């Protein structure tokens, strides 16, 4: 009987090891959708992605008027890992937002109208106080928690919150305090998505990027989905780096992401889809380390 138990234990151990080993051979892919809650058109696009059922991470902007809709949407999908898209700038000419903590609490972060500056350059040209940056980022986290969101990670809108080593240290401090992961802190390999690809070539671009992935590290695809609606097409980026016809680019990226061809490719046995909740459960918060670059 003793030997039977030993053999059974060995067999189960072998099966478990084989399963883990087989999983280790797969290329891990993590898709992160940014700017959720920015506007209604982005939220509707996010819903299309969520309806595919794939594990996905979605980074929420708590400052925007459509944040409340995003909260109600995200609560309905167990396949999503929710992050806070820490925001310190407001880049649209016709559509501006300001701090969660109130403009009087963080006067060095806002312009004369109480809105965030449009870019990192203009923000840091105003010599923002580190204490105010911490106050504001904390307020954004607290707002998300009060809304009832289960937050798994932090990231940063247009890199403003990690512009300097000092501001990055604030993000790290808050992540440790709230026991949250930070996007790009697990040695993720950044794979440029299709955002800047020509509108007509989004799908082909993304298919090629996935097909040519090589083993080594979790592959991070950051995407910006939306619908080409009057709401989105009216937005004009105050930063020159943004693509023209932004709403068409976002809609094309959405179409590529939810297309049957791309979804079928993602389900190829050689790949393993995961989100930040899954990644953190596998590696633990203690495995995070500051990346060499933003």
Predicted regions and their residues:
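Active-site beta->alpha N-cap acidic-glycine motif
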Residues: 23-93
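Active-site beta-loop-alpha junctions enriched in small/polar residues
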Residues: 36, 63, 85-91, 159, ...
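Active-site gating loops and adjacent loop-to-helix segments of metal-dependent hydrolytic enzymes
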Residues: 96-123, 237-245
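C-terminal domain-boundary segment and adjacent tail
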Residues: 182-185, 240-294
């Amino acid at each position: 009987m003793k030997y039977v138990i030993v053999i059974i234990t060995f067999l189960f151990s072998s099966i478990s090891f084989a399963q883990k080993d087989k999983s280790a051979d797969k290329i891990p892919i993590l898709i992160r959708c940014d700017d959720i809650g920015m506007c209604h058109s982005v939220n509707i696009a996010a819903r299309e992605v969520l309806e595919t059922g794939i594990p996905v991470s979605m980074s929420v902007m708590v400052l925007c008027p459509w944040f409340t809709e995003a909260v109600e949407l995200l609560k309905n999908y167990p396949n999503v890992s929710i992050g806070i898209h820490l925001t310190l700038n407001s880049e649209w000419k016709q559509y501006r937002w300001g701090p969660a903590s109130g403009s009087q609490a963080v006067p060095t972060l806002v312009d004369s109208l109480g809105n965030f500056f449009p870019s990192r350059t203009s923000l840091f040209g105003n010599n923002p106080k580190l204490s105010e940056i911490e106050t504001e980022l904390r307020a954004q986290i607290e707002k998300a928690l009060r809304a009832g969101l289960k937050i798994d990670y932090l990231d940063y809108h247009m890199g403003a919150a990690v512009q300097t080593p000092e501001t990055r240290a604030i993000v790290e401090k808050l992540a440790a305090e709230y026991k949250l992961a930070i996007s790009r802190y697990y040695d993720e390999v950044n794979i440029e998505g299709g955002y800047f690809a020509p509108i007509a070539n989004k799908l082909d671009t993304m298919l090629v990027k996935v097909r040519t992935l090589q083993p080594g590290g979790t592959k991070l695809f950051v995407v910006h989905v939306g619908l080409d609606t009057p709401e989105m097409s009216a937005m004009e980026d105050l930063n020159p780096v943004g693509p023209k016809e932004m709403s068409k680019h976002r809609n094309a990226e959405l179409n590529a992401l939810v297309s049957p061809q791309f979804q079928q490719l993602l389900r190829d046995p050689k790949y393993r889809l995961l989100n930040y909740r899954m990644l953190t459960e596998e590696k633990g918060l203690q495995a995070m380390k500051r990346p060499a670059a933003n």
